[in-house]
Amino acid sequence: AMQALFLMALEPIAETLADGNSYGFRKYRSCADATDQIYKCLHKKTSAQWVLEGDIKGCFDHISHEWLLDNVIIDKEMLRKWLKAGVIEKNVFHMTDEGTPQGGIISPTLANITLDGMEALVAKHSTRRDNGKTYSNKVNLVRYADDFIVTGDTKEVLEEIKSELIVFLKDRGLELSEEKTLITHIKDGFDFLGFNIRKYGNGMLLIKPSKKNQKKFAESTHEVIYKMRSAKQTDVIGKLNPKISGWANYYRYVSSKEVFSKLDHIIFLQLRRWSIRRHHDKSLKWIEKKYWQHDGKRGWIFGTKGKDKKGKEKIYRLIQLTHTPIL
C-alpha cells in the first residue's frame, strides 16, 4: 500500500522526465505503439538502413542502488528500505545489494527512470559533417522497458552510440550483453518484442510475428492439448480459446495473415491427433463428425454442444486465429 502511494507521487515526475519514445510500463502506451514508431522510422526508401538491437543483462536485477538513491526524487530512507528488502527465492531469504524490488509495483517505474536519458544521448548523433555539408544520421531510439533499438544511417554511427551507451549503463550498474547486442542491416531483419521487422527486396517493410514466438505458441497449444488428452471437448475449448484470442489480439496490428493461417492448421493437426488417440477403432469420418462442425465459409471448426453453468444448452467452438480481423 505504501509503495502504491509513493508510486502515485513518483509517476507524474517520471512522466515529465521520460524519453519520448519509451513505451513500456507507461499509461496509454503499448507494444503496438512501439512497433508503430519503428515502422515510421524504417518504412521509407530514404529511412535508416541499420539497427542496433540492444540487450541489457538482467536489467531489473542489477540497477545500482547508489544511482537510484542519488537520482530518484523520493524519500531516501523509504527507498533504501525497499531496495534492501531482499527477495524470497525457493523459501530462502536473500539480501539484495542491487536491482529493484522483486514484484514491487514501483519497480517498472524505477527501471524506466534509470534508462531515461538514452534518447538524449542518441540525439547527440543526429547529424554529421562531411565536406562542409551536414547530413542526417537518421538516428532514432525506441525503447520498451529494457528492450530497445536504435536506428542509424551507417554501421559506424551505431558503433559510436553503442560505446556511449556502455558508459551510460555502467554508471547505473548495468551492462549490455555482448553476444545479444547486434548491429543488423534492415534487409536481414531483427526481432523486437516478439515481432520480426524486415525490409524485403521490393523495399517494403513488413512486421510479422517472430519465428521464435510462433514456435513457442504452437508448443504451448500442444502442451495444453496433450495434458488434456482425457478431458471433455468443452474443457479443451475453454482452455485453448483465451490463449488463441490473446495471441491473435497481440499480433492483429501487423502482417499476420499467413502466420495465423499456418498456426490454425497446426492446431487443427494437434486436435486431430488428440481425437484419433481417443478413438483408435473409429474411422476419420466418424471422428470428424463427432468433434468438428461444418460452418459455411469458415469450413470445419472444432466444436460441440454442451451446457453452461446454468445448465442451458450452448455451442462451444474453438476460436480460429484467421477469424481475427487484422487492423
Name these PLM-found stretches.
Residues A1-L7, C31, T35, Y39:
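Duplex nucleic acid-engaging cores and interfaces of nucleic-acid transaction enzymes
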Residues G20-N21, R26, D33-G189:
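Conserved polymerase palm-domain catalytic core
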Residues K84, R172-K239, K243-S245:
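A conserved non-catalytic segment of reverse transcriptases
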